[in-house]
Amino acid sequence: MQNVLRDNQMIKKKGDVQLTAIWLPVLYLLSFIVCSDAVRFSFGMDLSFLFVLGIIFFYFAFYKNHISKASFYGWWIYLLIVPTLIMCLMKDGDMGHMIHCTLIMILPIVLEPFIPHDDKTISFGLYFVVGVSLLLLFLYANFGFLGNWNTNCMGYLLFLGFAALTVLLSKNRKNVWLWVFYAYAFVQLLVTGSRNISIAVIITALLVLLKGPISKKWVYRVIYTFAILYPLIFPWIATEMVGTALYEWLAEITETIYDKGQGGVFSGRPKLYLEAEKLIGESWVHYLFGYGRTMVSFYAAHNGYYVLHYTYGLIGTLVIVGALIYFFEKTFILINAGDSISYGCFAIMISVLFQQASEGWFLGTYLITLMPFVYMAIVIKRYRIYIQKRKNENGKEKDE
């Protein structure tokens, strides 16, 4: 396949960085304003409800041409808006939470208008995101800035900002300064005490370093398949590992580095997994179709698979998994065409899926950070441009 995405061929206009670069750091900072636990507790309401609805209305108002090309998504969004508005008025309404979580899954589509078209502008915007996240990380780790926020929540917010380095490194793996900043952020993130984040940092770094072999189709598919299945496999691994020599070794590391020894290596999660399995398997109807409400409104299973299965059932979970597979397959088309930016977004999304083994914040739960959906929106935007470019090229060949 011709590498149509290389050497800035995706640029609509060659030249200076476009103003749209500012949207990437703005969306990152919005995660702190509308998506954090601190804001929810301070205002007594979940402002991400209003944000998601607002962004969808913006999509309808200013992106009509794209909606006409993808009317299926447009009508689906429209049909969900009205019941969401009604349910938002109900205090702690379970159905409202479920619809809210379903709307969140559409964010990669409705955030696409905010994504720049060309490589240069995207890179500039991502540098801006990295700078903001490193500044916040420095203030948090050394001066206690926002120190009263949940440490895991801060870990996600900070990591998914500086993770933009993964995209930049995918384009230039020999840039020593980018690796220095990456290592600095990793050390500083240890302050959050999040083992999940530490693992995510290591995973993204390995995916960048092993970009060559991972770009092979069968290796790529093995990696994303395992990442999708890992939240399902992890509860069994955690349960079987308790009491083994490996568990004792990990317990020592947990106590010395992360100061979380009291809850064990997994902070009591195996017990939560057993309870979640009981709830999900209460009846075959619940097992297949779910409860139609979010688990996090009353119970935290700390596992992305259990959260989805409880809310949407096995059938709904398989539909969501199918959507993720579709996303990764389209991403590979871009990677195969030489698109390093899409490869970096792929690496970040793999780390996000691995984090779902012991957390459930990505899908089927409250909106904690916009950034995973921003990285997905980058891929969607680039894929749409790529397809249009291929159509134009094929049209020219036919004319000739």
Kindly label every feature range from the protein language model:
Residues 53-56, 346-353, 362-400:
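Transmembrane alpha-helices of multi-pass inner-membrane enzymes
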Residues 187, 191, 209-258, 279-282:
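A membrane-periplasm/extracellular boundary helix in multi-pass inner-membrane enzymes
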Residues 3, 7-12, 28, 51-66, ...:
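Hydrophobic, aromatic-rich transmembrane alpha-helices
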Residues 107-110, 114-144, 149-212:
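Alpha-helical transmembrane segments of multi-pass inner-membrane proteins
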Residues 15-18, 62-63, 71, 314-353, ...:
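Hydrophobic transmembrane alpha-helices and their immediate junctions
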Residues 24-30, 77-81, 331-359, 372, ...:
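Loop-to-helix entry and N-terminal half of a specific, functionally important transmembrane alpha helix
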Residues 47-53, 70-86, 91-114, 153-157:
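Aromatic-anchored transmembrane helix interface
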Residues 146, 260-315, 320, 336:
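Long extracytoplasmic/lumenal interhelical loops at the membrane interface
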